[in-house]
């Protein structure tokens, strides 16, 4: 690809990551939307006073809390979203409740024996998607900066409005840039 397409691709990737971050963690101020993690009144399930390891019981509690509030407008769009740290723990979780030897694994990541096609990643019957935009540095009680989040819900109900016809790239045309051998580029999505 040409340099212009590489720059466009890099800007687009950066803007998409920022949109993901804002949808999950946006502060609701300074032009940011209020993200899922900062929205008041949504259900949450705490694993313990000081955090703790994910268990099947807590997974079911989370599913139940969301579904009791009619949280699945489109049941086919209900998913889990979490970071890779939690994904690793989920891959070890068994139906018997422990990581060692009790029952079948709850997380199915067969993906046709790693040909990456076929069975999607599933936890307790629902799809699971990883994202490093889901925090892994949260604090709960005395566990400071080491706790993670799992988000569960109908992601078809997550809407972020944008305007314009796609990625707009503006190259700075300031004469001062030319004399200093600078190029300024701004991407707006």
Summary of predicted features, one role per range:
Residues 1-189:
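Structured, hydrophobic secondary-structure cores that serve as assembly/anchoring elements
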């Amino acid at each position: 690809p040409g340099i212009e397409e590489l720059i466009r691709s890099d800007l687009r990737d950066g803007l998409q990551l920022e949109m993901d971050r804002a949808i999950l963690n946006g502060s609701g101020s300074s032009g940011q939307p209020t993200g899922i993690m900062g929205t008041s009144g949504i259900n949450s399930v705490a694993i313990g006073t000081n955090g703790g390891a994910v268990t099947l019981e807590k997974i079911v509690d989370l599913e139940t809390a969301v579904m009791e509030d009619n949280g699945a407008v489109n049941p086919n769009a209900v998913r889990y979203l979490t970071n890779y740290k939690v994904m690793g723990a989920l891959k070890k979780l068994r139906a018997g409740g422990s990581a060692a030897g009790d029952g079948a694994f709850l997380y199915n990541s067969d993906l046709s024996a790693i040909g990456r096609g076929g069975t999607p990643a599933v936890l307790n019957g629902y799809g699971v998607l990883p994202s490093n935009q889901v925090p892994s540095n949260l604090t709960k009680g005395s566990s400071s900066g080491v706790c993670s989040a799992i988000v569960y819900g109908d992601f078809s109900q997550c809407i972020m409005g944008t305007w314009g016809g796609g990625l707009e790239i503006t190259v700075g045309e300031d004469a001062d840039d030319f004399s200093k051998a600078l190029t300024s580029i701004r991407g707006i999505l």
